[in-house]
Amino acid sequence: WEQVARQPTSAPDVFASAESLAYVMFTSGSTGQPKAVAIAHRGITRLVMSGRFIHFGPEEVFLQLAPISFDASTLEVWGALLHGARLVLFPPRQPTLEELGAVLVRHRVTTLWLTAALFEQMALHQPQALASVRQVLAGGDALPAQRVREHLSRLA
């Protein structure tokens, strides 16, 4: 704590514009070869401040499950923090369905990004763990409509 106490209490004197580089991610793209993609601050802001596809707010509880090197983590982290929501960090490993379910229940997670396959497995084997989840986002494949209907009927 001594080292922390010696740090400045004011914000760093750094200017970053909307076009400034926020981070670089690597994607395999369509060729399978790693390709660097530069992400500007504007892209993050547009993603998490538009609110056109998801509700952001201080009452939400986001689970940060995606690897930090994956673009979905941008939504999880900044979507929560820039709106005063709570962000629950899952250890950096693949959870079992039971472990994931326990975290969802313990922290009353309301917003969740999962692969379609993982959502389907949770809906089949841990449906009670999804009781507080009001927003499910997925990428890579379409969510299975039957599992979505079942989840929505449990929320009603």
Predicted regions and their residues:
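Motif- and composition-driven signal specific to adenylation
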Residues: 1-156
